[in-house]
C-alpha cells in the first residue's frame, strides 16, 4: 500500500555534499560518533557531518535539566490566606489559542486545501481523517509549513545525546540553586543520562530518515527538542506512523503529501473514528499534544471550515 510504504533500511547515502566539510571531528563529538559507528550507522557522510558541526551546544540539555530541576526542587508557593485573597474573580483561562480561529486563518486553510487537493484527498480516503482536521493540525503546528522551527534538528539531538555529565552543561548547572550538593549532582547525572539516551534514539531515527530522504542534515530545521517537518514528528515516530503520500518510496515530512498522510495515519492509529463523539475525537488529538487548548483549537478551526465534529 502506498500510504504505509517505508523507506528502505538499505537506502543510499546522500550524494550531495550539502554544507559538510572534511576537517577533523571535534573531540567533544567523538564518543557519540563512535557510538553511532558501533551501532552500525557508519557511512561516508558521518565523519564530514560531525566535522561540520562545531562543538555541542549546552542549550538543549541545559534547558531540559533546568525545567526538570525547577519542577523537582523549587520551593512550592505558600497558599494565600483567605483574608488576603483578591475579591475580583480571576480571569478564566482561554479555551483555544488566541488569534488562531479567525476568518483570515480559515481562508488560509481553505486555500491550502485547494492547492494540495490530491494530497488531502489521498490521506482522507486512506486513513479516514477529515481534511479539515488535518489542515487545522498543520496550521497549529507549523502555520502550514511556514514556520518549521528555529533550531537545527540534527545538531539539537546530537548535542543532547552527547551531554551525559553535568560538566557538559556547566553554565546551566551553576544557575541551579543547591546543585553542588552530592545528592543533587547525582540527580542531575541520572536525568542527563536518561535524556541523553532518549535523544540518541531520536538521533538514530533522524539519521536514517535523512539518508533515505536526501535532506541536508545540517540545514534541516526543527523544534527545540528535534521535532521535524510540517507535522512536527519526533524522528522515532516516522518509523511508526510515517506514510508515503506521493508514492516516491520515501517518507519526507517536508513535503505536503507525506506530512498530511503521516499525521492522518498517526490519528487513525490512535483511534480516530468518524462515528466517535466530539469528546472522543478530542482525546485522539490530545495524543499528539496532551493539553486541552491544543485539541480545542484544532477542532474549533476545523469546525470554522465547516467540519461537524459529532
Where would I find each of the regions flagged by the language model?
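Cell-wall glycan-active module
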Residues: 1-222, 226, 231, 236-310
